[in-house]
Amino acid sequence: GSIYVLNNPYYPVGDQISATAFAAYCRDGNFIMLCSGGYVGMYQQQKGLGILYEMLFALFGNFNYTPAKILHVIWWVLAILAGYGFLKLNTDRAIFRIVYCIMMLGCIPFLLYLPYIYGDVLSISFGMVMFWAVSAYEHYEKKRYIALAACVAGIAVLARKNTWIILFGVGIF
């Protein structure tokens, strides 16, 4: 995965470039995109992604997409491991974990299609970690798992507002 994203000449376009431009502008003290006619003023859900990129740009420089691409791969691996861990805690039958791993191979086109962070992979990954953490809390009864679930839930919602759906699922679970 890392070799693919590092060798892929993909650069953000459309909404992606607007979200990263918002982060770079904010780092320079220009908040024009927050106005009612600005990009983030019209698309409020992009604030979280802009904050994520603002942190990445603060560490690695404006419009440096390489760290974002590497994080994309790390979050995919984290999502796969969290899902596997969730199944390991909730079932003793290995067939479910085997089927899960085979089904996760179906996500490879998503990785190839999106070698760049746009919030989807982050929210999926941290949503999976949240399910694992809640399940681990039920299994081990250690408060650190609930703290982890709360932290990753907050980050997941920050990246993508539709992650609220997962939070309702956890509440029902």
Predicted features by range, described:
Residues N8-F22, D28-L52, L59-T66:
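Extracytoplasmic catalytic/substrate-binding loops of multi-pass membrane glycan-assembly enzymes
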Residues P67, I80-G106, I124:
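Transmembrane-helix signature of polytopic, membrane-embedded enzymes
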Residues V99-I108, W132, A153, V157:
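Short helix- or helix-capping micro-motifs
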Residues L112-S123:
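Short acidic/glycine- and proline-prone juxtamembrane loop motifs at membrane-interface regions
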Residues H139, I166-F173:
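Perimembrane helix-loop-helix junctions
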